[in-house]
């Protein structure tokens, strides 16, 4: 019933817009497309979104060089993963390193956490713990799930895919790759980024890990501002502000 009402509302809005095409600068086709995207995202179940994340992550892994567990990167990440834990709010977490000079790290709704060797070359283990704690925050707080649904909706609208149960099995490798890329390149709001920062701080404290690494990670990333173009925090709030927020939390003991 909820889905029927939602679709009816979108259809009604679309009909009204069609009658006043391009009025007041509104692009009717874009508005209708946005409405359909919203509907597709709203009707995709959490289970299906995580199933898509499972396959999307596998597709990303197949397209990247993954560091072996015996490599220096694999050994470092194993130590970091042990410190952070392999479960976040009931979601199993798996960690891997991509061998690339890009500076990035991300997590999907299914607990798939990936960090790039370019980032590990720039930071010590404690700083990487802070960064990955932030990415785990997006998973725990539902941000990653919402972005997976939104990314699916865009591809589903483009390729006319229905949001039926078990939709993950209908997707091609190309579609899975597009959805995964859209989800991991999502531009979160300032509030969501701040929430993930605070989650990381709290997680580090809970796990007995130094929170100073979170400050250090922001300071390192701040040095990239205006420099290297492919940085994981290109779309995030200024790193200097975030570092100061964590310093304030450390000073207050809260």
From Swiss-Prot:
Q: Where in the sequence is the active site?
A: 135
Superkingdom is Bacteria
The name of this protein is Metalloprotease YcaL
Question: Where is this protein primarily located?
Answer: membrane
Cofactor(s) the protein needs: Zn(2+)
Q: Where are its TM segments located? A: none
Share any extra remarks.
YcaL, BepA and DegP degrade stalled LptD substrate at distinct points in the outer membrane protein assembly.
Per the UniProt record, the source organism is: Escherichia coli (strain K12)
GO MF annotations for this entry? Answer: metal ion binding; metalloendopeptidase activity; metallopeptidase activity
Q: Which family does it belong to?
A: Belongs to the peptidase M48B family.
Task: Name the job this protein performs.
Answer: Involved in the degradation of the LPS-assembly protein LptD. Degrades LptD that have engaged the Bam complex but are stalled at an early step in the outer membrane protein assembly process.
What CDD domains does the record point to? M48C_loiP_like
């Amino acid at each position: 019933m909820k889905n029927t009402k939602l679709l009816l509302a979108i259809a009604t809005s679309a009909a009204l817009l069609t009658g006043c095409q391009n009025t007041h600068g509104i692009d009717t086709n874009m508005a209708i497309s946005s409405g359909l995207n919203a509907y597709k995202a709203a009707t995709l179940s959490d289970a299906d979104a995580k199933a898509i994340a499972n396959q999307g992550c596998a597709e990303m892994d197949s397209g990247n060089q993954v560091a072996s567990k015996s490599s220096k990167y694999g050994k470092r990440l194993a130590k970091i993963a042990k410190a952070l834990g392999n479960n976040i709010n009931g979601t199993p977490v798996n960690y891997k390193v991509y061998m690339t000079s890009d500076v990035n790290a991300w997590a999907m709704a299914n607990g798939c956490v990936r960090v790039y060797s370019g980032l590990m070359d720039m930071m010590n283990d404690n700083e990487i713990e802070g960064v990955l704690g932030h990415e785990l925050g997006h998973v725990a707080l539902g941000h990653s799930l919402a972005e997976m649904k939104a990314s699916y909706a865009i591809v589903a609208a483009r390729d006319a895919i229905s949001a039926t149960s078990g939709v993950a099995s209908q997707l091609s490798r190309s579609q899975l790759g597009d959805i995964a890329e859209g989800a991991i390149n999502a531009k979160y709001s300032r509030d969501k980024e701040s929430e993930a920062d605070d989650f990381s701080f709290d997680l580090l404290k809970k796990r007995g890990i130094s929170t100073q690494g979170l400050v250090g990670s922001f300071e390192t990333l701040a040095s990239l501002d205006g420099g290297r173009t492919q940085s994981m925090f290109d779309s995030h709030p200024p790193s200097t502000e975030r570092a100061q927020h964590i310093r304030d939390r450390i000073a207050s003991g809260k």
